[in-house]
């Protein structure tokens, strides 16, 4: 079949040139332009429509068609031969005529100023002046005033025409008229005429003023007559006017109130941290100098001269020279040398001024900080009225002899005052360079004095005062930590002082967070190393001392505990978890330490609500050792607790008398350091207090973790101990009520997740007797459930094919228009280049002619 077709095609090709039918002869296509779409398989009955194609012919046909249609529309895009009424709002009755005119004017101006093609640089804007083109104005010699309303606008006047184009006739005629008429006035005549005009104007103004006065007097008389008539009216009108007076508005009242309000007075600017630190340091230095002066027994008024009482018959002959101010007369270069005298006098004057300033400062400081010392003095000492009965020997003795030597004995009152001053705290402290120096400064002092010493150390060594103060305060943080540890490890730990020192630790931590975090990490690392070494050597580790517990408490106060990861808090959490899992509970002291660590855990995770499994394990162990040992308790214990053994019933109370006498109270923290020997009753009371603390912590955990999906799975062991075993124990009524409230809170929580259950086996379906008919379709055909579905798929396929064809044609149209636009741009550029070249040629020709003419002139 294929060969037959090919032979037939060949015959047709040979027969084509012969025009036997009389029609036009068909041209044979170029074989290189023919594209044959070869098919892999010949299928009988299938009609092939696009097996042979001519791409060049089809492309030329498409270009010719676009030239006849699309190019024609593109060239006529700005042409219009149909009159369309495009006036704004012409057929809109809702707009007033004024609004229509305004909007039309705006659109006209907008259309006038907008460029048709923003990329066409050859398109210039037409410049206008008062609505008239500048090109038209430049053609006229005279600029016509736009404000003139004459009908002959732009026309030349007759005088101007006669003066410019009269040929001199206008000038001669004006001269003749001047000769025939009066002669021009002289300067004297002009001045007399000006004076006469000014006098005439003055007379007219005087007449107008007199007329105005007469009218005013007449109006005054008329007003008096009318006023008499108005005064005779009844009082009802006045009452009505009073009633009709408007009440003051709230706004007016508010404005008046604001007008009378006191205005804020400007205050001094706020001082920076550096300025405040400098002022505080200066104040402490002055106070320290005052303290040292009082400690040495120096009188503050010894340099001041006491006023002496002079009698009426005093001859004022008691004048004594304080010092011999006589000078040796000397000459230099024939002149008296007085420079030394002037210099000494100036120095003495400066010294007196400084003494006065220091005295003023000392008096201010004494008024502020030493009120007690002032109160001790007698206000009515009458020092200004002391008698002048003093021996001449005392007046003649110099001041050095009056003062006592340092080795001399002081009076008893002075000795007591000196001892009190010596016991007073200094105001200036140097930063300690070692822990021993800090301990020497703080040891033996009360809590208030220790806090005051630390505060003054910080103020005197503020980082803004000197360069090295930052390193000193960073060391101070570590020394304070070590000092707190020493206070905690004493036999009677001073917890109040530790609590107050935490405030200074917090301020130092805010100033130097990096060094503070390094110091606390170092302390926690040492505690963990000690615990690991003890586990390696002994196989188990004891709970750390009270100092480590206080360090963990301070860590939670100084640093944020809600962060996902923190360089200090995260190691602290790990340290606490290691304590609860690796330190066995051997005594009541260990129970107290473990409960304190549980409290710290809850404080750390109060915001983040992070799940801590070690916490629940330890609380479960505490509840377990508070119940008697039985075979099955519904829970499994994890290290460090044991189900059976020596300490498996550590918190069990068997004496009912102790149960009845127990009163709930908080566990003292100093018991964690050292638990003194207790009696049996005190030990049982301590056990019950531990159980109460455990139950309160359990209730707090229930409220915190109630939103967890695994809530019931976590608290199931605790619930079993509380409901079955702890209820059987003889506990106080208060603890039983607390346990019941915890159980009710657990049972009241909804179960957020369902436990996994094995899938049940599927039921065996019943046998169906109705056969299932399946339509067997040919391979490769598009299958559909119904005719409607098949029609829908056919339309979707057709739409997709047509859409692709439309996109292809639009893309080709855009390419065609782009080629046309590019050709236009190239034509315009070529035309512009041609004109520019022509201009350059003409200019070159002109320049050549001018140079030739110039050379010709030079030759002549």
Swiss-Prot record:
Tagged with keyword Nucleus? yes
Q: What is this protein called?
A: Nucleolar protein 14
Its function?
Involved in nucleolar processing of pre-18S ribosomal RNA. Has a role in the nuclear export of 40S pre-ribosomal subunit to the cytoplasm.
Residues where Phosphoserine is found: 96, 146, 148, 346
Disulfide topology: none
Cite a GO CC annotation: nucleolus
- Where are the stretches annotated Disordered? 1-33, 161-417
Subunit structure of this chain's protein: Component of the ribosomal small subunit (SSU) processome.
Basic and acidic residues bias (residue ranges): 174-225, 236-260, 270-303, 320-357
Which compartments is it annotated to reside in? Answer: Nucleus, Nucleolus
- What are the recorded Gene Ontology BP terms? ribosomal small subunit biogenesis; rRNA processing
Which InterPro entries does the record associate with it?
Nop14 (IPR007276)
Question: Entry's PANTHER family?
Answer: NOP14, NUCLEOLAR PROTEIN 14
Q: Any idea which UniProt keywords this protein has?
A: Nucleus, Phosphoprotein, Ribosome biogenesis, rRNA processing
Enumerate composition-biased segments (Basic residues).
1-14
């Amino acid at each position: 079949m294929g060969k037959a077709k090919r032979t037939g095609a060949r015959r047709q090709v040979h027969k084509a040139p012969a025009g036997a039918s009389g029609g036009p002869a068909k041209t044979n296509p170029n074989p290189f332009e023919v594209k044959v779409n070869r098919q892999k398989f010949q299928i009988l009955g299938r009609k092939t429509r696009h097996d042979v194609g001519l791409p060049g012919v089809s492309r030329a046909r498409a270009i010719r068609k676009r030239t006849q249609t699309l190019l024609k529309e593109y060239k006529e895009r700005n042409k219009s031969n149909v009159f369309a009424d495009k006036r704004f709002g012409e057929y809109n009755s809702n707009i007033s005529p004024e609004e229509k005119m305004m909007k039309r004017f705006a659109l006209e101006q907008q259309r006038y100023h907008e460029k048709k093609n923003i990329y066409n640089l050859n398109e210039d804007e037409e410049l206008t002046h008062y609505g008239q083109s500048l090109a038209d104005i430049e053609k006229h010699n005279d600029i016509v005033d736009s404000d003139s309303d004459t009908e002959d606008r732009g026309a030349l006047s007759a005088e101007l025409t006669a003066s410019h184009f009269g040929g001199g006739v206008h000038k001669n005629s004006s001269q003749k008229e001047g000769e025939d008429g009066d002669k021009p006035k002289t300067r004297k005549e002009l001045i007399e005429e000006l004076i006469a005009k000014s006098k005439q104007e003055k007379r007219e103004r005087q007449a107008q003023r007199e007329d105005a006065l007469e009218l005013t007097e007449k109006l005054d008389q008329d007003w008096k007559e009318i006023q008499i008539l108005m005064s005779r009216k009844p009082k009802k009108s006045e009452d009505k006017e009073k009633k009709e007076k408007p009440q003051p508005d709230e706004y007016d009242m508010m404005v008046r109130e604001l007008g009378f309000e006191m205005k804020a007075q400007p205050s001094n600017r706020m001082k920076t941290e550096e300025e405040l630190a400098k002022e505080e340091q200066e104040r402490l230095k002055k106070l320290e100098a005052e303290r040292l002066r009082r400690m040495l027994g120096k009188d503050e008024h010894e340099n001041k001269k006491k006023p002496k009482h002079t009698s009426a018959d005093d001859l004022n002959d008691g004048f004594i020279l304080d010092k011999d101010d006589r000078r040796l007369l000397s000459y230099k270069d024939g002149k008296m040398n007085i420079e030394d005298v002037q210099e000494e006098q100036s120095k003495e004057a400066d010294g007196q001024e400084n003494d006065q300033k220091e005295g003023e400062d000392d008096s201010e400081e004494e008024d502020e900080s030493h009120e007690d010392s002032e109160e001790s003095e007698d206000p009515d000492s009458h020092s200004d009225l002391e008698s002048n009965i003093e021996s001449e020997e005392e007046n003649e003795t110099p001041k050095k002899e009056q003062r006592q030597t340092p080795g001399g004995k002081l009076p008893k009152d002075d000795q007591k005052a000196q001892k009190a001053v010596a016991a007073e705290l200094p105001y200036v402290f140097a930063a300690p360079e070692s822990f021993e120096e800090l301990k020497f400064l703080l040891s033996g002092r009360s809590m208030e004095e220790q806090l005051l010493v630390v505060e003054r150390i910080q103020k005197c060594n503020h980082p803004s005062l000197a360069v090295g103060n930052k390193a000193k305060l960073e060391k101070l943080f570590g020394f304070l930590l070590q000092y707190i540890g020493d206070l905690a490890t004493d036999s009677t730990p001073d917890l109040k002082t530790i609590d107050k020192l935490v405030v200074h630790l917090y301020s130092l931590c805010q100033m130097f967070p990096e060094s503070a975090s390094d110091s606390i990490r170092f302390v926690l690392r040492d505690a963990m190393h000690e615990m690991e070494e003890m586990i390696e050597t002994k196989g188990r580790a004891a709970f750390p001392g009270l100092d480590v517990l206080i360090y963990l408490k301070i860590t939670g106060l100084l640093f944020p505990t809600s962060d996902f990861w923190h360089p200090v808090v995260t190691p602290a959490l790990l340290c606490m978890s290691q304590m609860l899992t690796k330190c066995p509970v051997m005594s009541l002291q260990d129970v107290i330490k473990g409960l304190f660590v549980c409290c710290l855990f809850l404080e750390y995770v109060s915001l983040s609500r992070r799940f801590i499994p070690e916490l629940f394990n330890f609380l479960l162990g505490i509840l377990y050792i508070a119940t008697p040992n039985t075979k099955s308790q519904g829970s499994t214990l994890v290290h460090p607790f044991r189900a059976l053994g020596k300490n498996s019933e550590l918190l069990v109370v068997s004496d009912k008398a102790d149960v009845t006498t127990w009163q709930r109270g908080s566990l003292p923290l100093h018991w964690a350091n050292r638990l003194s020997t207790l009696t049996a009753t005190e030990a049982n009371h301590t056990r019950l207090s531990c159980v109460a603390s455990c139950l309160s912590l359990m209730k707090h955990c229930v409220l915190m973790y109630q939103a967890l999906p695994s809530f019931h799975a976590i608290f199931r062991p605790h619930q079993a101990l509380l409901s079955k075993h702890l209820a059987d124990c003889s506990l106080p009524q208060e603890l039983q009520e607390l346990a019941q409230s915890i159980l009710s809170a657990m049972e009241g929580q909804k179960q957020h997740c369902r436990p996994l259950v094995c899938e049940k086996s599927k039921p065996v379906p019943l046998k169906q007797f109705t056969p299932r008919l399946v339509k067997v379709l040919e391979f490769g055909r598009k299958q559909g459930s119904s005719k409607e579905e098949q029609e829908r798929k056919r339309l979707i396929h057709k739409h997709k094919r047509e859409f692709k064809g439309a996109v292809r044609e639009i893309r080709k149209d855009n390419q065609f228009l782009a080629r046309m636009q590019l050709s236009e741009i190239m034509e315009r550029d070529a035309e512009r280049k041609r004109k520019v070249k022509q201009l350059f040629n003409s200019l070159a020709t002109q320049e050549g002619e001018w140079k030739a003419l110039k050379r010709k002139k030079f030759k002549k």
